Amino acid sequence: YQGSYVGFHTILLSTIVLVLPIGAYMLLHADSYAALLPQVLLFLVFSVGIFFPLLKVIWIASLLNQNSMGIAEVDAILFEKELAEPTNPKRPTEATISFENVTFAYEEKEVLKEISFTAAPGTITALVGSSGAGKSTIAMLTARFWDIENGNIKIGGIPLKEIATADLMNQIAFVFQDNPLFFDTIEENIRMGNKTATAEQVEAAARAAQCHDFIMALPEGYQTKICDGGVYLSGGEQQRISIARAILKDAPILILDEASAYADAENEHEMQIALRSLIQHKTVIMIAHRLTTIRNANQILVVDQGQIKEKGSHNELLEKHGLYADMWSTEEYSSSWTICAGKEAVTE
């Protein structure tokens, strides 16, 4: 719609350029110059006067087009078929995650094939692999964002389809690469993890997530509003708010999807402390592109083209000299790259 708006805007701006040469030509070939001149002047004035009314009409038309696209997206969500709720729901008593020969496809495109692994409470299971390999899909299926075609996914020995959605969501906390924050206060954004939490509990979660100090430096502390008339937070600060939210929820299962993506030299240490506070005694599924962040995971699953190609600890996978070893070597090599300026080189 923006392209059409710009095109019509350009055409309207060009009307006087089109009228002038035509009017000049008509005046040169007119039998009566005096009789034709008022008509030419009228068209010149008309071409300028009609510009702004037509521009408003085109602008409104473009907004209507934009609104119709937004309505279509909202309708797609509202009319999305809900997942079936179990008739006799069961509630897990522990947080072991089991994938048993899971196959899944987006419409007709198969993205996971015969995935099997077990993640026990108090352990970290890391998923690594190239973009599009299926890592995030595995994490999302753990929360039953979609139903699978074949196989079974269980939490505490209970298939996901037999767990009520509300109970399942209470079992899982998420920290994503891009963390949604709402146009509300910092305190309410953290309290999204536990709507009944007190102000003291919110502050304790913020301290554990290493974000209390930067929150107190904001104009109104925990009552500072985010965005829309308030402040804007950096990517690293948003992630630590999301970690505080997950700490406050205290769910037994934790899914981390590139949770340290925005960590830099200044806040990486704080981010690691926050994550250590978050993952204690939980079943953790962690997706990472930087292998240094998951080298201490209890098990690492190397996902490639929708399949688990390798499985083991960091040292075990290095000894296999397979995909993981190649990825580790590539990361180590890239960390030694230098930026050259003339005859000087600066090591990264």
Which ranges hold each PLM region?
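Short beta-strand segments of immunoglobulin-like
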Residues: 87-89
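Cytosolic ends of transmembrane helices, especially the final helix of ABC transmembrane type-1 domains
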Residues: 3-8, 49-77
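A hydrophobic transmembrane-helix motif
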Residues: 1-44
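Residue-level signal for transmembrane alpha-helical positions in Major Facilitator Superfamily
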Residues: 12-19, 66, 198, 252, ...
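Alpha-helical transmembrane segments of polytopic integral membrane proteins
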Residues: 17-24, 54, 67, 71, ...
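Conserved catalytic core of two-component sensor histidine kinases
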Residues: 44, 51, 169
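ABC-type nucleotide-binding domain
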Residues: 92-348
